């Protein structure tokens, strides 16, 4: 495997310098719409597709109420986006500089909602980190408990 940033990987894929590309949305949706790329396999049943919001441990310890409010607001936006996908696609296309057809495809398969990290989620991520280390994709073994939220 060759590890490239999304823009470099797309260029390599587009030129035929790589035969396949592992990527996530909205880059996947863009490749599908603009390059005619097709999905050979996805991670359904292997790993969960999650996104994360981070803060420093110090900030989280000093301002838990701010983080609670942030999660509430993110969930409010997610609820709106889930019910208004066309409007959300238009908004997102302006922010990302992508055609609305791309953001519409991306949002059509997106999962909405934010929740605190749990021990189960951390265990999923630890298994992925361990596999990456075993495959020599990362240089050292990680202990994700070091990144666990305060109080977990």
Which stretches of residues belong to each language-model region?
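Short beta-strand-to-loop elements that line the ligand-binding cleft
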Residues: 1-5
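Pocket-lining segment of extracytoplasmic ligand-binding domains
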Residues: 6-94
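Residue-level "edge-of-site" marker
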Residues: 26, 45, 106, 145-146
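Short secondary-structure boundary/hinge segments and terminal tails
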Residues: 31, 48-50, 110-111, 148-151
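Residue-level detector of family-conserved "landmark" positions at structurally sensitive sites
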Residues: 42, 103, 142-143
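Residue-level signal for threonine
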Residues: 56, 118, 148-152
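Secondary-structure end/capping motifs
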Residues: 61-139
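C-terminal solvent-exposed extensions
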Residues: 134-152
């Amino acid at each position: 495997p060759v590890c490239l940033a999304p823009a470099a990987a797309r260029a390599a894929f587009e030129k035929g310098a790589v035969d396949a590309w592992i990527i996530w949305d909205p880059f996947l949706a863009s490749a599908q719409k603009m390059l005619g790329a097709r999905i050979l396999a996805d991670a359904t049943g292997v790993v969960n597709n999650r996104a994360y919001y981070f803060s420093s441990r110090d900030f989280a310890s000093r301002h838990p109420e701010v983080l609670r409010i942030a999660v509430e607001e993110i969930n409010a936006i997610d609820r709106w986006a889930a019910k208004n996908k066309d409007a959300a696609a238009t908004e997102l296309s302006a922010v990302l500089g992508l055609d609305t057809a791309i953001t519409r495809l991306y949002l059509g398969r997106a999962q909405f909602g934010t929740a605190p990290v749990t021990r189960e989620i951390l265990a999923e991520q630890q298994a992925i980190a361990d596999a990456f280390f075993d495959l020599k994709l990362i240089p050292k073994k990680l202990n994700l408990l070091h990144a666990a939220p305060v109080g977990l």
